[in-house]
Amino acid sequence: MNARENAIVQKYALSFVEKVSDHADIWDMYDQISDLISIIHDSKLNRILLSATVSREEKADFVRTVRQSSFWQINDLIEDVIRDGHADLLLETLERVQLQISKFKNEFEARVVSVYPLTEAQKERLRHLVEQRFSLRVRNITEELDQSLLGGFIVTVNHKVIDASVRTQLKDIRKKL
């Protein structure tokens, strides 16, 4: 994405968050935006939106079929993106809206990669650690399993990382030797 497109995406996202920042339903909107992002990824809709061979009208029709949000603000955002001819930036816009809501509320999703699933007690300890270390609130913890870590975990929150994996520790030891 070039600087011009980045500015367009940022404009849409900031405008949307300014409109909805006082709503009590902001996290419900966040969840519906997450659902839309999942639909776009699962259906490979972004390939169509980025394609130069698909007409602007066809792109608009495809997007309108998935734009069934119960919040008029989300539907208006999507309609604005389509109307302005930026359907190819829809996915990036929705992702940026999520990021801006999280920044506004200082509440973020945490992604944890570990060898084994975490217990609820471990998740709570991890939530507390992340909230203290990064001075933010953790809204949700998403787990991913990866056997190549050998042990430990990697936590990613708002582009910040805590890497306590055995694999990384072994690499550090190897560098020192």
Curated annotation (Swiss-Prot):
InterPro entries: ATP_synth_OSCP/delta_N_sf, ATPase_OSCP/dsu
Membrane topology classification: Peripheral membrane protein
One GO molecular-function entry: proton-transporting ATP synthase activity, rotational mechanism
Subcellular localization, as worded in the UniProt entry: Cell membrane
Keywords from the named record: ATP synthesis, Cell membrane, CF(1), Hydrogen ion transport, Ion transport, Membrane, Transport
Aminoacyl-tRNA synthetase listed as a keyword: no
Location (main, coarse): membrane
A Gene Ontology cellular-component term: plasma membrane
Ion transport among keywords: yes
One Pfam family here: OSCP
Free-text function comment from the UniProt entry: F(1)F(0) ATP synthase produces ATP from ADP in the presence of a proton or sodium gradient. F-type ATPases consist of two structural domains, F(1) containing the extramembraneous catalytic core and F(0) containing the membrane proton channel, linked together by a central stalk and a peripheral stalk. During catalysis, ATP synthesis in the catalytic domain of F(1) is coupled via a rotary mechanism of the central stalk subunits to proton translocation.
Similarity remark: Belongs to the ATPase delta chain family.
Quaternary state and interactors: F-type ATPases have 2 components, F(1) - the catalytic core - and F(0) - the membrane proton channel. F(1) has five subunits: alpha(3), beta(3), gamma(1), delta(1), epsilon(1). F(0) has three main subunits: a(1), b(2) and c(10-14). The alpha and beta chains form an alternating ring which encloses part of the gamma chain. F(1) is attached to F(0) by a central stalk formed by the gamma and epsilon chains, while a peripheral stalk is formed by the delta and b chains.
UniProt protein name: ATP synthase subunit delta
Organism: Streptococcus suis (strain 05ZYH33)
Designated gene of the protein: atpH
